[in-house]
Amino acid sequence: MTEYTTRAEWTGGHAGVLRCSNGPSFPFSAPEKLKGEAGVLTPEDAFVGSLNTCFMLMFIWAVERLKIGLVSYSCDATGFVEDRLDRTSRFGRLLLRPRIVARGCTREAVERALRLAEKYSLVWQSVNAVVELEPEITVAPD
């Protein structure tokens, strides 16, 4: 079984440093509106970002296997927080909006790559919220 580890170290206030097993470290804090610091990673950013980055990497993997000529890829991701009556909250929905420009393929091939990325994205498959995909696909002429 594969394992991924991190270590969170408190640095004072509502902040800390996240140390990842593959090397990088990131300062983090609560969001500014919750007594956090501006300009650093928040757990909420990391959650939405982990879905966005994992999905992108799996899309690149699928594009390579399907021999799609990828010209460009970018994706905006938004997490929608639901506030509950008991004063707790959760991400109820996440929305990915990838913008893809490909060449030398069909739109259907790009859509297949998107489906494969969804299926094989570890983070997507692990999320307990609804994840929606609204792609903007452009197939450029050869």
Enumerate the predicted regions with their spans.
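Extended beta-strand/beta-hairpin segments
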Residues: M1-G49, L57-D142
